């Protein structure tokens, strides 16, 4: 069976793991980081994903996309989307009722759906796994927040498809963390576990019971807009005010200054989890003013006091919903980078009367860890006793039901029902001789359907004339393990039936759209690779030219070279260097042609020099042109300098 990976697709950071040899490996990306920013950037020349995208955000804020998870599977008119848009530096537009991100890429305007942006992050995670495993990876388990509704789950699955992944299952993040935890701690009897997940952008609390390898989610609550970024914002505002006080200048209108300040604040926040104070030093932050300051942990805690305290409300709600007293919670698990903050750990511990939360699993990695275990189970990896014994029960995040007379919400599947599940109920007509019924499916907890979210609707027609209340219409809700729902209605007298799969009405991508996006993803991948080889050819030429220049300015070489040869070579090198300065965006072929031209002048001259008994005459001893490719620094080798140390080694520049 091909390997299957687990991906934690986070709002701000993502993480990937694989289950191998009875243990989980969390896989580091090409920058050596075990988590990758969920950022995608578009520039004049290329597309960047992950660290590279986040690192250049200050220079390119309007074309650097993040937080796609806040838009995925939602409608443009969704109040959440409207309020989020106010804070995004990139442009979100309405396209057929869905939010679409508009950026400038390679000089023209391009539009991407949130699914496409997320698919790019997923592709990055997949490639991270592939380069580690040395083979292709197709199967994955991807996690979503517990309160994601049906369309958000579908859209996440679509993002996986566009990334060329076969999504084995979408599972809830707390469930994944619980699996990670369940493998670490096998205990007798039923255990109540509270998962406290405070990430970069969101906050989720879930209560699970674990018994003999069976996980059940009892209840979930949270705040979609609370996380590390909010703590960063408090620091940013604090320092903007300090800058105003000290320098009488307002830097908040300058996007780049704000971005640099935010990066420094994120770093400071992380430091304050282990140190009592830290300093911030940013050169030329705004209008040439250097900003040097410091902040203590106590001040940081005070700035975020209300936010930290507010994390306790969902904890209370989860216990209330699950009808469990806090003294009955056996284990508390901390997940998400923000749970490293000592004050948060203390609040949690105090709430549970001094009980120490469990932090044995790296909080950034716990979700990917569990997803990787689940991926191994679903892909049939039964090599491990530990994966063999897990059974997973997820829950419906919101109640689902239909509208009955007078706009009343009649739930068939209650919130927190274990899924997969199937429920049927019989309804009837509201008027005499009513020829058909409109089945409208809603999700939500409110008593009236107008306050809930319409998932979809369909009609069942051809009901024979009869007095009201006589026809029997059986409505069945069937929710599968991915939380995808089939709703059907059957008129018992005639056997007439109709059904809906709750996908399209909620703005799910059509098959054609997914295929188009898949093709585009391939195209972008090819473009990314072409750009990389173009840069490599440019660096190769640059490295070769500068190496030659260094070589002929070396006094030992100087005295052995013919003056006219040296002049000829110098002119050619200068010509190449000035061409390079003016043609940074040339094609790979043009760079290679320039290199050939330079070599045609340099090689005969350098051969004479070696013929004259110059030192280091061994092929490949590091002199440009010394006996074949071994000695061309960067000739086709992406700027790698082989052999001696005469020329500078050129590294790729961001």
From Swiss-Prot:
Alphabetized InterPro entries for the sequence: ATPase_NBD, Heat_shock_70_CS, HSP70_C_sf, HSP70_peptide-bd_sf, Hsp_70_fam
Keyword Chaperone: yes
Keyword NADP: no
Region spans: Disordered: 612-654
Biased composition regions of type Gly residues, renumbered to the chain: 612-646
Keywords for this protein: ATP-binding, Chaperone, Nucleotide-binding, Stress response
A molecular function GO annotation: ATP binding
Pfam families reported for this sequence: HSP70
Gene3D superfamilies referenced in this protein's UniProt entry, alphabetically: 1.20.1270.10, 3.30.30.30, 3.30.420.40, Actin, Chain A, domain 4, Substrate Binding Domain Of DNAk, Chain A, domain 1
PANTHER family: HEAT SHOCK PROTEIN 70KDA
Family label: Belongs to the heat shock protein 70 family.
This protein's name: Heat shock 70 kDa protein 2
Organism of origin: Paracoccidioides lutzii (strain ATCC MYA-826 / Pb01) (Paracoccidioides brasiliensis)
């Amino acid at each position: 069976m091909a390997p299957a990976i687990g991906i934690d697709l986070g709002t701000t950071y993502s993480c990937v793991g694989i289950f191998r040899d009875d243990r989980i490996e969390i896989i580091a990306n090409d920058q050596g980081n075990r988590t990758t920013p969920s950022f995608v950037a578009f520039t004049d020349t290329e597309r960047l994903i992950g660290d590279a995208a986040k690192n250049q955000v200050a220079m390119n804020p309007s074309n650097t996309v993040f937080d796609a998870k806040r838009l995925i599977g939602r409608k443009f008119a969704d109040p959440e989307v409207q309020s989020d848009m106010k804070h995004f530096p990139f442009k979100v537009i309405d396209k057929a009722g869905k939010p679409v991100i508009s950026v400038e890429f390679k000089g023209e305007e391009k539009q991407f759906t949130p699914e496409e942006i997320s698919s790019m992050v997923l592709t990055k995670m997949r490639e991270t796994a592939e380069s580690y495993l040395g083979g292709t990876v197709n199967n994955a388990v991807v996690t979503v927040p517990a309160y994601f509704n049906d369309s958000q789950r579908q859209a996440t699955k679509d993002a996986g498809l566009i990334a060329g992944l076969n999504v084995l299952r979408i599972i809830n993040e707390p469930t994944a963390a619980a699996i990670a935890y369940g493998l670490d701690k096998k205990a007798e009897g039923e255990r109540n576990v509270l998962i406290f997940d405070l990430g970069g952008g969101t906050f989720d609390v879930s209560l699970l019971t674990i018994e003999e390898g069976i996980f059940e989610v009892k209840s979930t609550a949270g705040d979609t807009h609370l996380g590390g970024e909010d703590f960063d914002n408090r620091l940013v505002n604090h320092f903007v005010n300090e800058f105003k006080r000290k320098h009488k200048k307002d830097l908040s209108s300058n996007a780049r200054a704000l971005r640099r300040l935010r990066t420094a604040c994120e770093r400071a926040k992380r430091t304050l989890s282990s140190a009592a104070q830290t300093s911030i030093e940013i050169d030329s932050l705004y209008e040439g003013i250097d900003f040097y300051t410091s902040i203590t942990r106590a001040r940081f805690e005070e700035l975020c006091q209300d936010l930290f305290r507010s994390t306790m409300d969902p904890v209370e709600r989860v216990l209330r919903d699950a009808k469990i007293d806090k003294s009955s919670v056996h284990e508390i698990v901390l997940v998400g980078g923000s749970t490293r903050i000592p004050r948060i750990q203390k609040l949690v511990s105090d709430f549970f009367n001094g009980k120490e939360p469990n932090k044995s699993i790296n909080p950034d990695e716990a979700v990917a860890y569990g997803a990787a275990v689940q991926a191994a189970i679903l892909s049939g990896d039964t090599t491990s006793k530990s994966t063999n014994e897990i059974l997973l029960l997820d829950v419906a995040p919101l109640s689902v039901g239909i509208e009955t007379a007078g706009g009343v919400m009649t739930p068939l599947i209650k919130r927190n029902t274990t899924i997969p599940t199937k429920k049927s109920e019989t309804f009837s007509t509201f008027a005499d001789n009513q020829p058909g019924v409109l089945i409208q499916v809603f999700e939500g907890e409110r008593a009236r359907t107008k306050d809930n979210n319409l998932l979809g609707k369909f009609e069942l027609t051809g009901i024979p004339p009869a007095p009201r209340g006589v026809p029997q219409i059986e409505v069945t809700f069937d929710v599968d393990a991915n939380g995808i729902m089939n709703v059907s209605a059957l008129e018992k007298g005639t056997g007439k039936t109709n059904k809906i799969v709750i996908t399209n009405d909620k703005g799910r991508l059509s098959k054609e759209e997914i295929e188009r996006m898949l093709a585009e993803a391939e195209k972008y991948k090819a473009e990314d690779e072409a750009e990389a080889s173009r840069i490599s050819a440019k660096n190769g030429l640059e490295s070769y030219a500068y190496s030659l220049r260094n070589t002929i300015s070396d006094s030992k070489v100087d005295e052995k070279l013919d003056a006219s040869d040296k002049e000829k070579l110098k002119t050619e090198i200068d010509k190449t260097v000035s061409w390079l300065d003016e043609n940074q965006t040339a094609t790979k072929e043009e760079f290679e042609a320039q290199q050939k031209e330079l070599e045609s002048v340099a090689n005969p001259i350098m051969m004479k020099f070696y013929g004259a008994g110059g030192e280091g005459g061994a092929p490949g001893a590091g002199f440009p042109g010394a006996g074949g490719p071994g000695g061309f620094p960067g000739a086709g080798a992406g700027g790698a300098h082989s052999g001696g140390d005469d020329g500078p080694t050129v590294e790729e520049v961001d």
